[in-house]
């Protein structure tokens, strides 16, 4: 995310960015520091002097750019798909792998999402289709990842809603 700030005439670009990566083995996402893409570097350079003349100082040699990716990897390839799969289930899209994707998400990520949602009780277990349960329909109404939404709802049932909100 970038924003334009008046008076900024110099951008120092280290050539790095933080990108979220989902690890299907742990079921968690983490931020990784990676080289910026060529498109990202061009966009950053445009931040200098957006409103007046400016300079972009890059902290890498131009020859290093041959190793840069042309553009950032599509986010869906590295995302936790559980929230998305829960929305698909509620919308009636039962088999995400059959949708006309621009970039097909990894099967492992879809499998982990199904497993996580079934474990929470958000979708019916033991089926390849995404069949939402009443709990799943409640979870999708909260603007949170399914695990946190489930934590809040279950804690509220036991009188610990405020504590769970602090933990979440």
Show where each model-derived region lies:
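C-terminal accessory/connector segments of nucleic-acid motor ATPases
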Residues: 58-168
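Conserved segment of the helicase C-terminal RecA-like domain
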Residues: 5-10, 14-68, 82-87, 167
């Amino acid at each position: 995310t970038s924003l334009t700030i008046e008076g900024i005439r110099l951008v120092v670009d280290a050539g790095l960015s933080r990108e979220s990566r989902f690890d299907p083995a742990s079921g968690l996402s983490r931020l990784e520091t990676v080289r910026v893409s060529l498109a990202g570097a061009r966009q950053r350079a445009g931040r200098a002097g957006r409103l007046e003349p400016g300079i972009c100082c890059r902290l890498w040699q131009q020859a290093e750019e041959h190793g840069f990716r042309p553009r950032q990897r599509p986010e869906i390839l590295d995302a936790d798909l559980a929230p998305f799969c829960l929305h698909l289930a509620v919308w009636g899209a039962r088999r995400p792998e059959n949708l006309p994707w621009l970039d097909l998400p990894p099967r492992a990520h879809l499998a982990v999402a199904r497993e996580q949602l079934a474990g929470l009780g958000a979708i019916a277990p033991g089926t390849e289709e995404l069949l939402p349960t009443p709990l799943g329909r409640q979870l999708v109404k909260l603007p949170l990842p399914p695990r946190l939404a489930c934590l809040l709802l279950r804690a509220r049932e036991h009188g610990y809603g405020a504590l769970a909100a602090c933990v979440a």
